[in-house]
Amino acid sequence: MKQMGSMHPVQVIAVTGGKGGVGKTNVSVNLALALADLGRRVMLLDADLGLANVDVLLGLTPKRTLADVIEGRCELRDVLLLGPGGVRIVPAASGTQSMVHLSPMQHAGLIQAFSDISDNLDVLVVDTAAGIGDSVVSFVRAAQEVLLVVCDEPTSITDAYALIKLLNRDHGMTRFRVLANMAHSPQEGRNLFAKLTKVTDRFLDVALQYVGVIPYDESVRKAVQKQRAVYEAFPRSKASLAFKAVAQKVDSWPLPANPRGHLEFFVERLVQHPATGSAV
């Protein structure tokens, strides 16, 4: 990912799942660490506005959150937590109903806050909330890349399809990347992807790309108990090696060559009303 002056593109990846329990936050955290391990400057945005998870998963205690930035009480750099591997973390603005309910002044302040740090950043990983509510749609719609996490539960495929359908029909999104998580074999991961593509190919005009599989690994549970990322706590585990492989794929994804790739434009899209596309 090349530097391009003061307005270099930032790869924005929204990690989502359509339901809870698919391991989405674990994927976000460990993907961020694996990308940092490749030499990328990574920021992780905890976008679960109702239930902050990233800081809990890593045993971090935020003194301030994005809500303080939105309200003008501090700068974005004041809320950043330093995670493992040099990953910077923006704690969730818990209690904030939606990013679309901002005043024009808050809107402008948020765009400025992110533009101030974009020179020192290559990748922004966004850990979204579960479900298909306005908050999730806002973050996913604003990102350049959508990484959809699925697992071997019947509701996982159903909910992933519901999210794809909503984003496709209401917001014109046509490209999604899919990661199978907690799979008991590589074939199980491929089968999950096949199930999802079977329904999307039949009913929607979208393109799904299979990113890979993270195997079921007891090391992940042990790391969670330690409040550490598995990539850091057990670097030679099956899950960590899989995250490394996924990060190498992600690192090869093309950067947007137009202004859409600049961080300010991500925030601009984020604070647009999801139903109308107009800023509020």
UniProtKB/Swiss-Prot annotation:
Disulfide bonds: none
Activity regulation, short description: ATP-binding allows dimerization and subsequent antagonistic effect against FleQ.
SUPFAM superfamilies registered for this protein in UniProt: P-loop containing nucleoside triphosphate hydrolases
Binding-site positions, ATP: K19, G20, G21, V22, G23, K24, T25, N26, E153, N181, P215, Y216, D217, R221
Superkingdom of this protein's organism: Bacteria
Annotated function: ATPase that plays an important role in maintaining flagellar number in Pseudomonas aeruginosa. Exhibits anti-activator activity against FleQ, the global transcriptional regulator of flagellar genes.
Quaternary structure, from the entry: Forms homodimers. Interacts with FleQ.
Name of the featured protein: Antiactivator FleN
Organism this protein belongs to: Pseudomonas aeruginosa (strain ATCC 15692 / DSM 22644 / CIP 104116 / JCM 14847 / LMG 12228 / 1C / PRS 101 / PAO1)
Lineage of the species this protein comes from: Bacteria, Pseudomonadati, Pseudomonadota, Gammaproteobacteria, Pseudomonadales
Gene transcribed to yield this protein: fleN
